[in-house]
């Protein structure tokens, strides 16, 4: 759940961070050598980026970005709010580079960096450029990451920080994300939505005692906004992982890593591990929780209908609806396969 609505809206309200490599210059992007395992396939580029910056011309920006994406066959999600931009887009490299160039022509985004990964098929079905109240929904008025945030910690320095006994390490992600992986020793608030975090922090963090707090999330946006909240309520020593879990998994060798498990991502890949290798997870179509091969062996797992997480959360009528949807999905898939083999 996210802000009382279905988790499918995470595509609109959470960061959708994906991935691999910060690129600061267009020429760097153009010269990048693909690491895809299938050399017969020209991979699509997936670019994830965000920036907290004051924006007042949202409608104009929306039109410009949407037009540029459509012109260049780029799909994905772009969220715009007065506090900034949050996006993940995917398409041919040339198209993605043109979109990023167009955005960076705006002086407010001239220093925009992005994280880059690859996909052998388009991970997004549509292009959505949306205007929002917040680019990541915390729901607390007055929190402004453009004015005040915590201290960035590079992935190479993260292990040393979170290993210190007086540092309170907090995973700011939702429970369906933390369930498949987190940092060793981190506290999981058990969130259904990011907007629940402020009330949890108010109960657990006593600003008067001036604790040392380290926060992390998938790609950096949620923990950055979380540190802004803690700084606003008076906590002085607040840190957050620069580039998020994904940058850590990319840069820190597995043998040195304090990460345990996999990292949930908000696209059809579902999860990645060390080195940003694809992990063996898929989503339950009923509840959207990530499922491992072991989860799929559960007696409660029915493809497209239920899993061990949701089997007792839906009615008989809902399950019947899911079953019909699954039937239609399989029928459409078989027709597509039949068409493919007939060509």
Regions found by a protein language model. Give the residues of each.
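N-terminal amphipathic/basic-hydrophobic helices that include classical n-h-c signal peptides
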Residues: 1-26
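Rhodanese-like catalytic fold shared by cysteine-dependent sulfurtransferases
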Residues: 28-149, 174-213, 221-343
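A conserved helix-loop-strand patch within extracytoplasmic ligand-binding domains
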Residues: 146, 150-154, 161-162
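Glycine-rich active-site/cofactor-binding loop and its immediate structural neighborhood
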Residues: 165
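Structural scaffold elements adjacent to functional motifs in cytosolic proteins
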Residues: 169-171
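Cofactor-cradling patches in redox/metallo enzymes
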Residues: 216
């Amino acid at each position: 759940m996210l802000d009382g609505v279905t988790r499918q809206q995470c595509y609109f309200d959470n960061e959708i961070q994906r991935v691999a490599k910060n690129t600061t210059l267009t020429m760097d992007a153009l010269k990048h050598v693909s690491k895809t395992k299938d050399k017969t396939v020209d991979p699509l580029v997936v670019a994830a980026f965000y920036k907290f910056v004051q924006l007042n011309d949202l409608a104009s920006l929306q039109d410009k970005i949407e037009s540029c994406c459509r012109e260049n066959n780029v799909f994905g999600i772009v969220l715009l709010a007065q506090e900034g931009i949050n996006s993940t887009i995917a398409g041919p490299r040339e198209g993605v580079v043109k979109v990023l160039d167009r955005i960076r022509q705006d002086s407010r985004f001239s220093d925009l960096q992005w994280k880059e990964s690859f996909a052998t098929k388009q991970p997004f079905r549509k292009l959505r450029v949306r205007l929002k109240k917040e680019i990541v929904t915390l729901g607390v008025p007055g929190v402004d990451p453009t004015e005040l945030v915590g201290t960035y910690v590079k992935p190479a320095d993260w292990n040393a920080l979170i290993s210190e006994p007086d540092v309170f390490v907090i995973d700011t992600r939702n429970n369906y994300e933390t369930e498949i992986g987190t940092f060793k020793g981190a506290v999981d608030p058990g969130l259904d939505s990011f907007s629940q975090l402020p009330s949890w922090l108010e109960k657990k963090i006593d600003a008067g005692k001036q604790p040392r707090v380290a926060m992390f999330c998938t790609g950096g946006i949620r923990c950055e906004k979380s540190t802004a909240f803690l700084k606003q309520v008076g906590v002085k020593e607040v840190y957050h992982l620069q580039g998020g879990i994904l940058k850590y998994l990319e840069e820190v060798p597995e043998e040195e890593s304090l990460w345990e498990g996999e990292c949930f991502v908000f696209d059809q890949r579902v999860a990645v591990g060390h080195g940003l290798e694809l992990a063996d997870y898929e989503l339950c179509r009923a509840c959207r929780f990530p499922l491992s091969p072991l989860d799929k062996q559960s007696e409660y797992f029915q493809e497209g209908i239920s899993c061990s997480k949701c089997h007792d959360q839906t009615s008989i009528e809902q399950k019947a609806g899911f079953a019909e949807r699954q039937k239609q999905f399989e029928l459409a898939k078989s027709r597509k396969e039949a068409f493919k083999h007939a060509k």
